[in-house]
Regions:
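Generic protein-terminus/edge-of-domain signal
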Residues: 1-67, 71-73
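An accessory alpha-helical subdomain
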Residues: 142-143
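A hydrophobic/aromatic-rich effector-binding and dimerization subdomain
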Residues: 2-12, 69-139
C-alpha cells in the first residue's frame, strides 16, 4: 500500500449540495487519500478490488457501496485481484455543512444521524441494500 496520503480538494463549491461523478475504468489507480467531504462511493463490476478505509481492508464483490463520513478518513480502492476491464464507479460527495443548523438533530432524522455516525469509520452496505438503491443512484446522474 502507498504510504503517501494525498488530501483531495473536492470540486464541491459552497453553492453546491452535491458533486457527482461517474467513471468507467479498466483499473483503479487513484492513490490513498482523504478529504473533509462526506462521500458515497458505488462500484459495479469490481469483484476482487481491494477496498481500504481507515484500518479496514476488504476484497469486494461485483457491487460495492460505502458511505464515508469521517473527517479526513483515509481511503482507497486498489486493483487487487480484479480482472474486470469494465469497472463502473459513481462517487457522490456532499458537505458535512449540509446538515448544519441542528437540522440533523430533529427526531425525524434520528436514523439518518445514526447512519452518519456509524459511517465515521466507513459504512459498507450489504448487497441487498445496494440492489434496492441501484436505480436511485443511476437517477442521480441525470440531476
Amino acid at each position: 500500500m502507498n504510504k503517501h496520503i494525498i488530501t483531495e480538494i473536492s470540486p464541491l463549491s459552497e453553492k453546491d449540495c452535491l458533486f457527482i461523478v461517474e467513471r468507467y475504468k479498466t483499473e483503479f489507480t487513484y492513490p490513498l487519500h482523504n478529504h473533509k467531504e462526506y462521500e458515497l462511493n458505488f462500484v459495479e463490476n469490481g469483484a476482487g478490488v481491494r477496498r481500504i478505509v481507515g484500518d479496514s481492508v476488504e476484497e469486494i464483490g461485483d457491487y460495492d457501496l460505502v458511505l464515508l463520513c469521517g473527517d479526513n478518513l483515509e481511503h482507497v480502492w486498489e486493483q487487487g485481484n480484479c480482472q474486470s476491464k469494465q469497472i463502473r464507479e459513481i462517487t457522490i460527495q456532499f458537505s458535512p455543512d449540509l446538515f448544519s443548523n441542528n437540522f440533523i438533530d430533529k427526531k425525524q432524522f434520528t436514523s439518518i444521524r445514526k447512519m452518519l455516525d456509524r459511517a465515521q469509520k466507513g459504512l459498507s452496505f450489504p448487497l441487498h441494500a445496494v440492489m434496492k438503491v441501484y436505480s436511485t443512484i443511476d437517477s442521480f446522474l441525470k440531476v
